Amino acid sequence: MERTFIMVKPDGVQRGLVGEIISRFEKRGFKLVGLKLMQISRELAETHYGEHKGKPFFEGLLNFITSGPVVAMVWEGKEVIATAREMMGATNPLKAQPGTIRGTYGIDVGRNVIHGSDSPESAAREIALFFKEEELLSYEKTLDTWIYE
């Protein structure tokens, strides 16, 4: 099964959206295999968002993501990366479809509630940044036979 990294950003935590976001992923049939409430260090933020280094918004992004607690998660399921991207909606909430997480709860591109991996490679990299292998659980969900062929 495929895995993806999902993070509820400080705005989502402060607004009390963690439970709603987890609920959406569970209702979609995905399995939660890792979960942490944490404060991101500047060093971790710089590594995580390294692809944006040198861009005009980089410093603001680092300040925001380290401004409060986040909820880091690993979800598992069939095509979970692509499906999670659809569930989250466009990065800019003003362009996100109604009903998506960002379309429903996002304020602006800098306060868009949630981050999710965009490829299998980024998922593997981000999961390894935030979780040790022993922090991820493998287990059988009794519903799996009702969800997957």
UniProtKB/Swiss-Prot annotation:
PROSITE patterns given in the database record: NDPK (PS00469), NDPK_LIKE (PS51374)
Keywords of the record: ATP-binding, Cytoplasm, Kinase, Magnesium, Metal-binding, Nucleotide metabolism, Nucleotide-binding, Phosphoprotein, Transferase
Enzyme Commission (EC) number: 2.7.4.6
Cofactor: Mg(2+)
An MF annotation (GO) of this entry: nucleoside diphosphate kinase activity
Keyword Cytoplasm: yes
UniProt keyword Transmembrane helix, yes or no: no
Active site (record annotation): 115
Top EC class of this enzyme: transferase
Amino-acid positions noted as binding ATP in the UniProt annotation, renumbered to this chain: 9, 57, 85, 91, 102, 112
UniProt-listed GO biological process terms: CTP biosynthetic process; GTP biosynthetic process; UTP biosynthetic process
One GO cellular component term noted in the UniProt record for this chain: cytoplasm
InterPro entries: NDK-like_dom (IPR034907), NDK-like_dom_sf (IPR036850), Nucleoside_diP_kinase (IPR001564), Nucleoside_diP_kinase_AS (IPR023005)
Pfam families per UniProt: NDK (PF00334)
UniProt xrefs under CDD domains: NDPk_I
The reaction(s) this protein catalyses: a 2'-deoxyribonucleoside 5'-diphosphate + ATP = a 2'-deoxyribonucleoside 5'-triphosphate + ADP; a ribonucleoside 5'-diphosphate + ATP = a ribonucleoside 5'-triphosphate + ADP
Subcellular compartments: Cytoplasm
HAMAP family the record matches: NDP_kinase
Purpose: Major role in the synthesis of nucleoside triphosphates other than ATP. The ATP gamma phosphate is transferred to the NDP beta phosphate via a ping-pong mechanism, using a phosphorylated active-site intermediate.
Family: Belongs to the NDK family.
Subunit description: Homotetramer.
PANTHER family named in the record: NUCLEOSIDE DIPHOSPHATE KINASE
Name the record gives this protein: Nucleoside diphosphate kinase
Organism classification: Bacteria, Bacillati, Bacillota, Clostridia, Thermoanaerobacterales
